[in-house]
C-alpha cells in the first residue's frame, strides 16, 4: 500500500486553472464516490480551497493509483490531460506525509502561517469520515497533521500576527490606492466608498480588516439579505448598509472599492455589466473568490482596475522575510511529527504476524485448558474455572508482550522484516510449501 497526493496549488497553477478545479462542499460526496470507484484506491480524502486542490489517497499501486486520480481531475475539470498535467504535482509515501503536515502547519500557504488552512484540513478529515472514504491510515495521518498544525502554532511564533487572504486583500487595496497617490505605503481607506459582495466567512474577515484600516462605512450585498443583516449585527462600530443581489449594479456605480467573495461558480460581474453602468469614476475590484466572481474582461474597461487572489503575492512578499525565519523552526517540528507517523505506519507491517501468533497461541491455550478442566472433575467450581482461565490468558499476554513490543518498535524495514521472518519460522506461522 502507498500513500500518495496528487494536486495543484498557487505554486503550480494560475487562478484561471485553479477555479476549474474547485470542488464545493456539496460536490465532495459525489467526488469521493467517483474516486473510491477506482479499484486501486483504498482510502481517499479531498482538500479544496481557493489556492489548492489536493487529493490524498491510500492506493494499492502508486503508479496506477496516481494515474486514476489524474484521470478523475481531468474529467472533473474538463481540461484535457495534456494541458492539465504540467500544473499537477505528485508526492509519494514519506513526501506525501510531509506535504500534508506542512500544509496543515501553514508552511505551504500563499500567506505563510495563515490559520484558515488548519480548519480546512479539519473539514477535509470530517468529510472523509462522514462519507466513509477514509480508513485507519488516512484517519491517523489527518489526525496527526491537524495536531501538527496546532503544535506549530502553539510552540512557534509562525501564527502570531499572521495575515490571511482577507487581510492581504485589504492591504492590496491600501497599496494600490497609495501608489495612485504617489506613495509606496499602505494608506487609510477612510475616504473610500467600499462595497463588499458576499456574507460568508471571508467577507466577515474582510470587514474586520477594513475596520482596522480606517473604513467606517460600507455597503454589504448578498443574495440572502437576512444573512447580510446577521453579519452586520456583529459590527456595531461600522455603518453597514445591507442590500440584495438584485441591487448590485446600482451599488457598484456609487462605489470606489469593491471586494467580492461569494460561492458562485460563475462570474457575477463582467464587462457587459460594467459598461451598462456608464462609469465616470475610477473603480477597483479585488476578487478573492475561487472560482472568480469577476470576469477577466472587466480589466478592459478604462476606469476599472481588477485584481484576483494571484495578485495578492505583491502584498504577501512584503511580509514574508520575517516569517521565513520562523518557518525554519516550524519545519523542524513538522519533521519530528513526520517521523512519528512513519514509524507507526511501518509498525503495521508486523500486525498480520502478531495477529497470527496470538491466534495460534490462543488456540493452544484453549485446547490445553479444556484438557486440564476435563480432568478436574465435577468438584471444580465455576469460579475456579474462571480463575484458571484468567491465569492462562495472563500467561499468554506476558509471553507475547516483549516480542510484540519489539516488532512494533522503531527500526529499519530490513530489521523488522528479518525479525518477522524469524518469528514466522520459529512458530511455524507460514506454510513452508508457499515459502519454498
UniProtKB/Swiss-Prot annotation:
Pathway stated in the Swiss-Prot or TrEMBL entry: Porphyrin-containing compound metabolism; protoporphyrin-IX biosynthesis; 5-aminolevulinate from L-glutamyl-tRNA(Glu): step 1/2; Porphyrin-containing compound metabolism; chlorophyll biosynthesis
Active site: 50
One GO MF term: glutamyl-tRNA reductase activity
Gene3D superfamilies: Glutamyl-tRNA reductase, N-terminal domain, NAD(P)-binding Rossmann-like Domain
EC number, as in UniProt: 1.2.1.70
Biological processes per GO annotation: chlorophyll biosynthetic process; protoporphyrinogen IX biosynthetic process
Keyword NADP: yes
Record-listed NADP(+) binding positions: 198-203
Keywords: Chlorophyll biosynthesis, NADP, Oxidoreductase, Porphyrin biosynthesis
Catalytic activity: (S)-4-amino-5-oxopentanoate + tRNA(Glu) + NADP(+) = L-glutamyl-tRNA(Glu) + NADPH + H(+)
Site (Important for activity): residue numbering on this chain: 99
The keyword Oxidoreductase appears for this protein: yes
Binding site for substrate: 49-52, 109, 114-116, 120
Enzyme class: oxidoreductase
Recorded domain comment: Possesses an unusual extended V-shaped dimeric structure with each monomer consisting of three distinct domains arranged along a curved 'spinal' alpha-helix. The N-terminal catalytic domain specifically recognizes the glutamate moiety of the substrate. The second domain is the NADPH-binding domain, and the third C-terminal domain is responsible for dimerization.
Misc note: During catalysis, the active site Cys acts as a nucleophile attacking the alpha-carbonyl group of tRNA-bound glutamate with the formation of a thioester intermediate between enzyme and glutamate, and the concomitant release of tRNA(Glu). The thioester intermediate is finally reduced by direct hydride transfer from NADPH, to form the product GSA.
Subunit structure: Homodimer.
Role summary: Catalyzes the NADPH-dependent reduction of glutamyl-tRNA(Glu) to glutamate 1-semialdehyde (GSA).
Similarity-based family: Belongs to the glutamyl-tRNA reductase family.
NCBIfam families recorded: hemA, PRK00045.1-3
UniProt-listed HAMAP family: Glu_tRNA_reductase
Name of the protein in its database record: Glutamyl-tRNA reductase
Natural source organism: Prochlorococcus marinus (strain MIT 9312)
Lineage, broadest ranks: Bacteria, Bacillati, Cyanobacteriota, Cyanophyceae, Synechococcales
Amino acid at each position: 500500500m502507498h500513500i500518495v497526493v496528487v494536486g495543484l496549488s498557487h505554486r503550480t497553477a494560475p487562478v484561471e486553472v485553479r477555479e476549474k478545479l474547485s470542488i464545493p462542499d456539496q460536490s465532495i460526496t459525489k467526488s469521493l464516490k467517483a474516486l473510491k470507484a477506482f479499484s486501486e484506491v483504498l482510502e481517499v480524502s479531498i482538500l479544496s480551497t481557493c489556492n489548492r486542490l489536493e487529493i490524498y489517497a491510500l492506493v494499492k499501486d502508486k503508479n496506477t493509483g496516481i494515474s486514476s486520480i489524474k484521470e478523475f481531475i481531468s474529467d472533473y475539470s474538463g481540461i484535457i490531460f495534456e494541458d492539465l498535467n504540467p500544473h499537477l504535482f505528485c508526492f509519494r509515501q514519506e513526501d506525501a506525509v510531509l506535504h500534508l503536515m506542512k500544509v496543515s502547519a501553514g508552511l505551504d500557504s500563499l500567506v505563510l502561517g495563515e490559520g484558515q488552512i488548519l480548519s480546512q484540513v479539519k473539514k477535509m478529515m470530517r468529510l472523509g469520515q462522514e462519507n466513509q472514504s477514509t480508513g485507519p491510515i488516512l484517519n491517523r495521518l489527518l489526525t496527526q497533521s491537524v495536531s501538527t498544525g496546532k503544535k506549530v502554532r502553539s510552540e512557534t511564533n509562525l501564527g502570531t500576527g499572521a495575515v490571511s487572504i482577507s487581510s492581504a486583500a485589504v492591504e492590496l487595496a491600501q497599496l494600490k490606492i497609495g501608489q495612485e497617490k504617489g506613495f509606496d505605503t499602505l494608506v487609510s481607506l477612510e475616504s473610500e466608498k467600499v462595497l463588499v459582495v458576499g456574507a460568508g466567512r471571508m467577507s466577515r474577515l474582510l470587514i474586520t480588516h477594513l475596520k482596522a484600516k480606517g473604513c467606517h462605512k460600507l455597503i454589504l450585498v448578498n443574495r440572502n439579505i437576512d444573512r447580510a443583516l446577521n453579519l452586520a449585527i456583529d459590527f456595531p462600530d461600522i455603518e453597514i448598509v445591507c442590500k440584495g443581489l438584485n441591487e448590485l449594479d446600482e451599488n457598484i456605480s456609487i462605489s470606489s472599492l469593491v471586494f467580492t467573495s461569494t460561492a458562485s461558480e460563475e462570474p457575477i460581474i463582467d464587462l457587459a455589466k460594467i459598461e451598462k453602468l456608464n462609469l465616470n469614476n475610477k473603480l477597483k475590484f479585488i476578487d478573492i473568490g475561487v472560482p472568480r466572481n469577476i470576469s477577466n474582461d472587466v480589466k478592459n474597461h478604462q476606469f476599472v482596475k481588477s485584481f484576483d487572489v494571484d495578485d495578492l503575492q505583491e502584498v504577501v512578499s512584503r511580509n514574508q522575510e520575517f516569517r521565513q525565519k520562523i518557518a525554519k523552526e516550524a519545519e523542524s517540528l513538522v519533521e519530528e511529527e513526520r517521523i512519528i507517523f512513519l514509524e507507526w505506519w511501518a509498525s503495521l507491517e508486523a500486525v498480520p504476524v502478531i495477529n497470527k501468533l496470538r491466534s495460534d497461541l490462543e488456540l493452544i491455550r484453549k485446547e490445553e485448558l479444556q484438557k486440564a478442566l476435563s480432568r478436574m472433575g465435577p468438584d471444580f467450581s465455576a469460579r475456579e474455572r474462571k480463575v484458571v482461565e484468567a491465569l492462562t490468558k495472563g500467561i499468554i499476554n506476558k509471553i507475547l508482550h516483549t516480542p510484540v513490543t519489539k516488532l512494533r518498535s522503531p527500526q529499519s524495514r530490513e530489521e523488522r522484516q528479518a525479525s518477522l521472518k524469524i518469528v514466522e519460522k520459529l512458530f511455524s506461522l507460514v506454510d513452508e510449501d508457499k515459502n519454498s
